[in-house]
């Protein structure tokens, strides 16, 4: 286990799950340890012949593109689980190619203990870019973002609403905050997740982004996660983060800026990335600025912290960030 146990993902799917299945748990206190970073976890997988690994997407990026990954015997790995943030299909494919393991993705929140949906266990039924199907006894609806009551059509984005035995009763001693995220639909109590997504024609759940992270480009909605996923398809890009920056000449509207971490040994220019993006995404989604970084700010569980990037940009402008949506 390489996830902190104070986070619901690490607590349930690493600590509790290993106890329930009576399996040996190899505890990695710091997955970044080693020279170069993340070498110790690769060595632990090899030495202890680890068969199951749960991690966040940022960790899979680090392992998949590790400069010495080919030197380790990772053949014991059979299955790996990803969650807590969006997993780029390009990362999953590189990781599976390097290890031979099958990478499954799940979705949920602390408020849903944490799983709400997950990929089917049959690899052939897995679909990259989706988070599978609702868990047993769980109902997921896609509702409009304004009222949280109107169900959206298949394929249309809306807020993800979750009903099931794993949904929290509420926030401790915070009745107003609880009331704001709980909605009664068809006589059942649903949790409004704050995530935007849709069901595709085959019934797979696709998470688009967080509602609060929407970028307003002249009235059009641009979702950072979608743009980040497209950017990581570039052969030179290892990780990307996207934010909206307020336009000083057009109050209420934003422009798209991308922060990019290149794969080891790669070099690129802003113009090169922006030119490449012209053929990959609509004009309003394309980054108008690209900044190269050695690393992106991340939380303790590996989530990219877009808020820090926003704060850095807005500090230059002397403004305070407020969500568009």
Question: Where are the regions that the model predicts?
Answer:
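Conserved ATP/PPi-binding loop(s) of AMP-dependent carboxylate-activating enzymes
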Residues: 133-137, 148-182, 222
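Acidic/polar alpha-helix N-cap and adjacent early helical turns
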Residues: 312-325
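Active-site glycine-centered loops adjacent to acidic/histidine catalytic or metal-binding residues
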Residues: 4, 84, 108, 132, ...
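AMP-binding/adenylate-forming catalytic domain of the ANL superfamily
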Residues: 282-304, 322-324
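Conserved AMP-binding/adenylation subdomain of ANL enzymes
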Residues: 6-51, 66
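Gly/Ser/Thr-rich phosphate-binding loop
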Residues: 20-21, 42, 50-55, 64-126, ...
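AMP-binding/adenylate-forming catalytic core of the ANL superfamily
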Residues: 46, 53, 164, 169-170, ...
């Amino acid at each position: 286990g390489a996830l902190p146990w104070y986070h619901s993902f690490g607590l349930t799917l690493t600590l509790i799950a290993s106890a329930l299945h009576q399996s040996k748990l190899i505890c990695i206190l710091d997955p970044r340890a080693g020279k170069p970073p993340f070498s110790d976890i690769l060595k632990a997988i090899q030495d202890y012949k680890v068969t199951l690994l749960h991690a966040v997407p940022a960790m899979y990026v680090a392992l998949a593109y590790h400069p010495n990954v080919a030197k380790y015997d990772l053949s014991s790995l059979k299955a790996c689980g990803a969650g807590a943030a969006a997993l780029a299909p390009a990362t999953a494919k590189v990781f599976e190619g390097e290890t031979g393991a099958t990478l499954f993705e799940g979705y949920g929140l602390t408020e849903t203990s944490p799983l709400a949906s997950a990929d089917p266990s049959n690899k052939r039924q897995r679909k990259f870019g989706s988070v599978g199907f609702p868990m047993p006894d769980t109902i997921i609806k896609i509702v409009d973002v304004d009222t949280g009551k109107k169900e959206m059509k298949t394929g249309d984005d809306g807020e993800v609403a979750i009903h099931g035995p794993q949904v929290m009763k509420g926030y401790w001693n915070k009745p107003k905050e609880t009331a704001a995220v709980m909605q009664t639909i068809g006589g059942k109590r649903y949790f409004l997740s704050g995530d935007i997504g849709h069901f595709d024609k085959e019934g797979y759940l696709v998470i688009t982004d967080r509602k609060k992270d929407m970028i307003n480009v002249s009235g059009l909605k641009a979702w950072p996660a979608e743009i980040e996923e497209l950017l990581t398809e570039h052969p030179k890009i290892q990780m990307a983060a996207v934010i909206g920056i307020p336009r000083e000449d057009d109050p209420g509207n934003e422009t798209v800026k991308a922060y990019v971490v290149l794969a080891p040994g790669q070099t690129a220019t802003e113009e090169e990335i922006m030119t490449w993006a012209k053929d990959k995404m609509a004009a309003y989604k394309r980054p108008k600025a690209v900044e190269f970084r050695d690393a992106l700010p991340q939380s303790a569980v590996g989530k990219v912290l877009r808020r820090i990037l926003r704060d850095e940009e807005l500090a230059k402008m002397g403004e305070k960030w407020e969500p568009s949506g």
